[in-house]
Amino acid sequence: RNAMVKLNDGISGEGNAVVDLKGLPDTKTTDFSTLLEERLRSMLFESSAVTFDSFGKSLGEMGGIAEERIEGSDFCSPSVQMRVSPLGEVEILSTHDQLLGGPSGQSFLGSQFPADPQYGPLIAREARKIGERLADYGALGRFAVDFVVVRNEQGEWESYAIEINLRIGGTTHPFEILQFLTDGSYVDEEGLFRAPSGKAKYYVASDHLESTLYRAFTPTDLFDILIGHGLHFDQARQTGVLVHMLATTGENGRFGVVAVGDSPAESQELYQTVQDVIKKEAEEAIRPRNSRELV
């Protein structure tokens, strides 16, 4: 099987590398070490800026771990966010399905809240066990556990905890944005977030809406586009899109969005629509003026 090598201090999957171990001979064969070294030198890094030598140097400095890469049918990568109080109580804050990309699908691009109900309760139960053990060790504050889930031969979901992040992660700020916008709260027993009205809320969020085309926009432009297309967050309905991380738009053409809906389908539709609309507006903005007038 393939193996995953992870740096201890890597973030967003950029400290990960995949090693192809398929077809290697028995460890007792004379050329095993040579063949293994060849596989290691050809490992696939998640970041294009990383080389074998630089990865090896980082591994020596900060340490890391090698583990089996879980593969299977209907592969998904959810996560559970938790908190340990000063009294040692473990609280489930949220569950998410992670949106991953990059060369080997290890880079964190965004998230969908909550995690799929088919396996959300499963990973929450397993995460609580981990949280209670961490509390016994004296952990305090926020942390998250990343999982992979796959279907077994019987069609049932199996979960594998693959990483503990003892820090605030990429799913923290979109969840807090939802709390701020709606004044609602997460109901652990249901695995849902409910507004004061009792209505469940869902979102898709990303920090990686990025294109050189978007450098043409100011933060005000983005707000105007959302309002002009009726995509902005509507406080009355408590649905819509909020943009953030706007300081990087002019320089890098990058910003973030949180698309809030009353169902998973609505939040996904809003997320896709805002991408389509902003791309179209960006293409229109850079077209020569006389070309626009002829249309």
Name every feature range the model reports, one short phrase each:
Residues 156-185:
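Active-site loop ensemble at the mouth of alpha/beta enzyme cores that anchors a bound cofactor
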Residues 78, 93, 172-176, 268-271:
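Short conserved micro-motifs at the rims of enzyme active sites and ligand-binding pockets
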Residues 2-14, 19-21, 31, 35-100, ...:
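Phosphate-binding site of ATP-dependent enzymes
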Residues 48-73, 104-156, 195-232:
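A long amphipathic alpha-helix within ATP-dependent nucleotide-binding catalytic cores
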Residues 98, 126-133, 180, 273, ...:
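Generic, well-ordered alpha-helical scaffold segments in large soluble proteins
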Residues 24-25, 271:
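Low-complexity, highly charged intrinsically disordered N-terminal segments
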Residues 183-295:
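Peripheral (often C-terminal) accessory segments that flank ATP-dependent C-N-forming ligase machineries
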